[in-house]
């Protein structure tokens, strides 16, 4: 009976998918189709908090600057900019050929050009408590901003912040039209008007989202051809990952992102190569991802083992990261054996962590000799990482540490971690912007959770001094030197145990051309075409 239900469910999803794709009369070879198994909650850039929101928002909106596939800052609506010698004043010259998507709210012409005052409005809105954007923190370093004229926008910082352009590349900082938001209010989330390569067509929430080509889009490719190439983007919302995978194998989705445990062995060999039976049908793309998976200690926990540097160091030494990646991830990812900062960013201390079971056992033995009881720790995770935590549980038992694994829903885990209710937790840190400061901020004492990302409540005066010096340092080489010192100091105290640095991995149909990957796993569709 259960098998019959699953078959009927899949038939229903297939019929739904077919009927949805037929409803838009566009050549199939010009429609890019993907599934989002998590629901999009908003198409408003002020709420571009998670990948499922950011991906469609990135097709609909533009900001002052953008990142290329190598994380280099590139022009977007700003065609050029200058930075004052003291690092406090950023002046942007705006393009004159950027227009909002068509809307009757613009009046007779149905559109208008973007001007500098639109960025003043967009930034005001991002900070507005009534909007309650989770991205308001992006402008914390900003003292003021103004429109000098229609095509010049100036930002004044409180203190120098060398990573500021990276912050501005986030979709939180996209430009939005005041006329449309004044009309729709909070319903702008489902009635977005932007400037991006695609415009909003239709959204049947939890079913399908359709975007269409913006024929007035301002960007061109390196050969001078207008972007985008595609006529439409069709996003399905099928929550079952197995059903998504089946549709992909049937050619009804153009790509899938990431690698789920339920089908990793079907697609990949144990060494991480694409299985030979799929080489004629699929392309695999993979590369560094600015995402560090780790376990964190809440250092104010009552458990004395958590407060013991010996126990934290023993855990860091007591499991084989290489085996973990091979066994659980088919070698997708890199063992995190050199600190918290992932591959692709400057600033790691470069000092490797050995796998040393004997030293780990000795550290546990010394802890017990000095009056401690056998360490018993509770590690909290969500269901997606249960296999990882059970691996750690087995390995650490071998060095004399007992781990109890508890599973919480993702939202509950996030809340409990932020409020200091978990003595030991599994977490991820995905870069918001491409600078090592983004990672090192997790150990700055003024960033204690729940108001900041220092979930461990690590506090060290020397670290804080180095962090503040780095923020005010405009010389890249000196700033990176401070980053290395901070990374080394944090590694020596072990407030967190880095597990692995993730990789972006995507599988695409052979007829998909122009798909690139980048270390922040942003989906860029303006340069994609289908044969």
Whereabouts are the PLM-identified features?
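Long beta-strand-rich cores associated with HINT superfamily self-processing modules
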Residues: 506-531
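Ligand/substrate-recognition segments at binding pockets and active sites
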Residues: 333-334, 365-431, 504
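Ligand-site clamp/hinge motif
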Residues: 186-189, 217-270, 402
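N-terminal lobe/hinge region of extracytoplasmic solute-binding protein
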Residues: 35-85, 124, 131, 193
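Surface-exposed binding/hinge segments that line
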Residues: 131-178, 199-204
